Structure formats: C-alpha cells, structure tokens
Amino acid sequence: MSDNQLSSNDVLARLAEVLESRKPANGGDPDKSYVARLFSKGDDAILKKIGEEATETVMAAKDARAAGQTGAEAGKVVYEVADLWFHSMVLLANFGLTPADVVNELARREGLSGLEEKARRKD
C-alpha cells in the first residue's frame, strides 16, 4: 500500500471518529454541530442530503465534461464527491458502520468481474 493510500485511510478513520463523537448519544450538540443536527433529525434527513449531494456530483461531472474535463470544472467534481463521501460517512456512522467496512467490501470484490459480482448477489 502506498503512503498516499495509508494517509487517505487515516483521514477517513479520523473523520469517522469525529462523526462518531458528534452523535447526540456521545455528547454531540445539534445546536452547535451540523453533523449532530443531521443525526438528531434521523436517517431520512441524512438520506435526503445524500440525494442532494449525488445530484450535485452528477451536475458537476456534466459541467466538467462540457468543459473538456479540465481546470476548475474538473475540480468541482472532486469538491462534490467529497461532499457525497462525507454525507455517506454520516450515514455509515448512523448505522454503526465505518469506512473500513466499505474498504473491506471493496477488497472482497477486487479482481472479481462486475458481472460476476452482480450475479452472486442474486443467489
């Protein structure tokens, strides 16, 4: 694993710890924390936010494609995907899951044809 991958995993793990600390059950204050407010509103509010961020990601990608996939428009894709990942991590935390659970699932699928993996889900 490269240093870049390790630091990326570290960032995700640290963020997961912060998200966990923002849960109202762990002392997160909805009046002082955006994440605590999302947790206090429940999973429908989190899911709505993920839907919004997914749409913004799609729109940023379309804008980047129209701009030749370079420059500031391409940078907006990264910005929107970061928002999408962040809110997906809030959802994971809401269900007691971590980024490591997702990474482990991706590792399980590594080297497996997408069509083969999809067929296995039907079993």
Swiss-Prot record:
One Gene Ontology CC term in the entry: cytoplasm
Pathway(s) per entry: Amino-acid biosynthesis; L-histidine biosynthesis; L-histidine from 5-phospho-alpha-D-ribose 1-diphosphate: step 2/9
GO MF annotation terms: ATP binding; phosphoribosyl-ATP diphosphatase activity
GO biological process: L-histidine biosynthetic process
Catalysed transformations (reactions): 1-(5-phospho-beta-D-ribosyl)-ATP + H2O = 1-(5-phospho-beta-D-ribosyl)-5'-AMP + diphosphate + H(+)
Enzyme class at the top of the EC tree: hydrolase
HAMAP family, alphabetized: HisE
UniProt protein name: Phosphoribosyl-ATP pyrophosphatase
Species, as recorded: Cupriavidus necator (strain ATCC 17699 / DSM 428 / KCTC 22496 / NCIMB 10442 / H16 / Stanier 337) (Ralstonia eutropha)
Chain's gene name: hisE
